[in-house]
Amino acid sequence: MAIFGAIADDFTGATDLAGLLARSGAKVSLRIGVPEGDESDAPFEVVALKIRTAPVSEAVSEALTALDWLRGTGAERFFWKYCSTFDSTAQGNIGPVAEALMAALGAERTVYCPAFPENGRSVFMGNLFVGQQPLAESPMKDHPLTPMRDSNLMRLLAPQVTREVGLVDRLTVARGAEALAEALAQAPAHVVVDAVADADLEVIARAGRDMALMTGGSALAMPLPALYREAGLLDDSAREATVAQVGPGAVVLSGSCSAMTRAQVAAYGGPAFRLDPLVLAAEGHGAASNWLARQDMGKAPIIYATAEPEAVRRAQGELGTGRAGEVVETALAALAVQARDQGARRIVVAGGETSGAVTKALGVSRLDVGREIAPGVPWCGCVSGGQEIALALKSGNFGRESFFADALGMLA
């Protein structure tokens, strides 16, 4: 029976959240899409959806369906997880989904805190920073799907919601959970909360522990297992997060065009094939498939569509933003299945949209969360095509430059 249910707007975000919760030693179950039955054998349930860039009506519908399933598992506290770089424009769905979940749960207010200090994301006076750069001055300003041109979370959120947006700043958070709880009780429906360090997140989580709904990045949920144990909602038993031993074959698939993923692709030393969206649109992925068929999975080849911003803009200009992403996702999803059939048992995927497409193509419905490769990126165990598979789903900007080699080395 679950005590906590989370809805994540993409697959890498779901594994990020599940990995941080699993640090506590509690069992975490990660579902790919909404399951059909209500059975749960874990206190923490995370449902991964693929709605980050979905139209508002579609995103709200899927999130409410996930909420209904999570309530059926016994969960009474819920979390709406989105990216630590917010990744949402004025037409985005973060606010509408939050309002729909609030209405379904009868919640008067909720908090918004995408901060993830361990990965360099912080919120100060309502402004989101990536490292020392305001969000709008960071590489996220050139994100191909959700270019972030404003750093102020209140301004980003206000056009998306129908009720007032407010701020509880770092000065209040620094006074502790009791002071924060008092401030939240007087705040409007949608409350952005500052956090610049993990200690701030613990204060926010403690103040909001009994809220029906909290929203934010994965790091905001990280203190919750300890708080639930403290309140007697979770037992003291702990387990080591592990993934079953799998075969030696491996493949790396990268659809992200983030600055960090570009550096990771450049640093990787395995056999490589680059996908060009314009070629994929005209000719399909036959050339990549033929190349992959000749590869030794023991050498962990990489297939990537990762490119510089100018190349991305050129492809989007000729194909349209949606089509440019679709041809890449379709190709990488098909190539993931081919690689599995050729013996790849460790599959590393970079990019949220790509991870969603690959996971669905592999027919994965549940992931068991294992050890973290980097903060927010765990190895996960699953079954695909009757085979035990280890899957790592990486958000574009996560990990250091050697991430791909680090990941494969961990399960060598």
Residue ranges and their predicted role:
Residues 1-5, 31, 43, 59, ...:
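Cap/lid and interdomain-hinge subdomains that line or gate substrate/regulatory clefts
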Residues 3-8, 45-53, 76-87, 194, ...:
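Short glycine-rich or small-residue beta-strand-to-loop segments that form or flank ligand, phosphate
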Residues 17-19, 90-94, 121-129, 179, ...:
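Short acidic, glycine/serine/threonine-rich loops at helix termini
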Residues 34-35, 55-70, 328-331:
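Glycine-rich, highly charged phosphate/nucleotide-binding loops
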Residues 40-51, 298-299, 381-412:
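A structural-propensity feature for long, helix-poor, extended segments
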Residues 131-290:
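Conserved, well-structured core segments that form the ligand-binding/active-site neighborhood
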Residues 299-350:
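C-terminal structural cap/anchor segments
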Residues 344, 355-403:
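Conserved, well-ordered active-site substructure
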